[in-house]
Amino acid sequence: MKTSMQRKLDQLTTRLAELNDLLSREDITSNLDQYRKLTREHAELGPVVEHYALWRQAMNDAATAQELLADASMRDFAEEEIRAARERMDKLGAELQKMLLPKDPNDDRNIFLEIRAGTGGDESALFAGDLLRMYLRYAERNRWQVEMMSASESDLGGYKEVIVRIAGEAAYSKLKFESGGHRVQRVPATETQGRIHTSACTVAVMPEADEIGEVEINPADLRIDTFRASGAGGQHINKTDSAVRVTHLPTGIVVECQDDRSQHKNKDRALKVLAARIKDKQSHEQQAKEAATRKSLIGSGDRSERIRTYNFPQGRLTDHRINLTLYRLDAIMDGDLDELIAALVSEHQAELLASLGDAD
């Protein structure tokens, strides 16, 4: 292990002891914001310090066994102990290196997941519905909570656009690599000749702002329109102007919400989605600046970037960013995304490790 890494781990061990002391103080526990911030830091540091303690134990075991080498009757035992201790040190050292990688500050946030039908008309809208079901099934497997924020249904089923809020542990960290273009190749239900059609949807995964105030929105920059909610095909489903459209004039971002009968609730939801979209836009602008110096294999999360192809006749999914092909499309469409997400996270970690190596 590098001296710089060991020094960092020693600092974290000291910091954890400080946090234990702080969290037992009454003036800290009475300040909810401060207490929440410190408990979050404590939860992050705990596993790292625990791993480091195991690494030091393995190092001490190796040192103790080294002393036994001088005794001929103990040499075989000592060599085996040294080998086992060094194996543990290597394994724990690699895990610690990953644990020390810079954390995305948004990783623990809830998300807004937005799916938009793209090229392909009705078939694209049907695929948007299939993608939504895939993510909802994955959310179910993770025991996450899902709330429908806005939906524009198409005539044949599926969605022209749909936005859901997903709340739960590590929602953003697991789904953040889903942003981009998703292409489908299959025979549509409406196709009589059996020809394979290609259509596409775009997915955007946006971290939820902790509070709307976290993103500065000047009320003077907003135009709020109310209108009558409508269902698929344009038929009116509500006789009051409960639907809300919020336009953020400086960015041109528009959010519509009409899923609730209450205008107040629709406005509240629209403002939450707007805050997330503005935050997402700011993040992408920052990432674009960084991408100018280092191109990420995982990609920029740009919606125009095609990231994945779903080929139904072959039962094949291909993620173009990491050249991964899986022949288990049915299971994936049923929400079994663990293998795919693990591969993307692993590639991202490898990139971060490589960039840290370059920095050294």
Curated annotation (Swiss-Prot):
Methylated by PrmC. Methylation increases the termination efficiency of RF1. It is found in: Cytoplasm. It comes from the Bacteria. Coiled coil: none annotated. Residues 280-300 are annotated as: Disordered. SMART domains: PCRF. The modification N5-methylglutamine is found at Q235. Keywords: Cytoplasm, Methylation, Protein biosynthesis. One of its GO terms (cellular component) is cytoplasm. GO terms for molecular function: translation release factor activity, codon specific. Signal peptide: none annotated. Gene3D superfamilies: 3.30.160.20, 3.30.70.1660, 6.10.140.1950. Residues 280-293 have a biased composition (Basic and acidic residues). Belongs to the prokaryotic/mitochondrial release factor family. Peptide chain release factor 1 directs the termination of translation in response to the peptide chain termination codons UAG and UAA. This is Peptide chain release factor 1. The lineage of its organism: Bacteria, Pseudomonadati, Pseudomonadota, Betaproteobacteria, Burkholderiales.
